[in-house]
Design a protein with these regions (language model features):
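Residues embedded in well-ordered beta-strands
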Residues: 16-18, 36, 111, 125-127, ...
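AMP-binding/adenylate-forming catalytic domain of the ANL superfamily
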Residues: 151-175, 192-193
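Conserved AMP-binding/adenylate-forming
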Residues: 1-74, 81-84, 97-98
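Conserved beta-strand termini and adjacent loop/short-helix elements that scaffold enzyme active sites
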Residues: 20, 113-115, 165
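Short, ordered coil/turn segments that flank beta-strands lining enzyme active or ligand-binding pockets
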Residues: 22-23, 71, 87, 166, ...
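Acidic/polar alpha-helix N-cap and adjacent early helical turns
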Residues: 183-193
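Glycine-centered tight turns that cap/initiate beta-strands
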Residues: 14, 106-109, 161, 167
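AMP-binding/adenylate-forming catalytic core of the ANL superfamily
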Residues: 41, 47, 66-157, 174, ...
Length: 193
């Protein structure tokens, strides 16, 4: 029952949903597999406002979300498609990493972005805005944060590095501007382990 309360819910009558992998193959509704969320139905748009081009892919609308669906049809959004980190053929949820890091008492805000990696394609880089009255040095907080993830996420999801910024850029509505962070750190070299 508690797990169901954590889900976003089920689709309404007349709407279908599915999750697909990078090759657009449908994934099982097992609550474990997650992929790009697609919907279709009478109440689903087929084109964006003031455009003539169809937004549909094989009659399905790509929501731009990454989700999983359990065997009861309960869906949970785990990330935005553009923010998921694809590492070694697996997907890492940036939102899960951000939520955990934000729980640390010295963290004001956390953003997790993908950094190019020669072996794994992408690896997570954690970008931290510290609270104004923080007590720890950057190195102390970095060490604490990397330990803070132990037991909370799969070990291979742990960010390869942590960097600190004065302010994480936000939109006018308060959403993180990950595009700006990706641009800022596009040449960043992850430490070799």
């Amino acid at each position: 029952q508690e797990k169901i309360l954590q889900k976003q819910g089920r689709v309404i009558f007349g709407v279908d949903m599915k999750i697909v992998d990078d090759q657009h193959q449908e994934l099982p509704h097992d609550g474990v597999a997650f992929g790009d969320l697609y919907v279709r139905g009478l109440w689903v748009i087929n084109q964006y406002y003031k455009t003539l081009d169809s937004a549909l892919v094989d009659d399905w609308f790509p929501t731009g979300d990454v989700a999983n669906i359990d065997d009861q049809g309960n869906m949970q959004i785990t990330d935005r498609s553009k923010d998921v980190i694809k590492s070694g053929g697996e997907w890492i949820s940036s939102i899960d990493i951000e939520n955990i890091a934000s729980g640390h008492p010295e963290v004001m805000m956390a953003a997790c972005i993908a950094i190019a990696h020669p072996k794994w394609d992408e690896r997570p880089l954690l970008v931290i805005e510290k609270k104004p009255n923080h007590q720890l040095s950057d190195q102390e907080l970095k060490d604490q944060l990397l330990k803070y993830f132990e037991g909370k996420i799969a070990k291979w999801w742990t960010p390869d590095d942590v960097v600190f910024v004065e302010k994480i850029p936000l939109t006018a509505t308060g959403k993180m501007q990950k595009l700006k962070l990706r641009e800022q750190f596009k040449e960043y070299q992850l430490p070799t382990i």
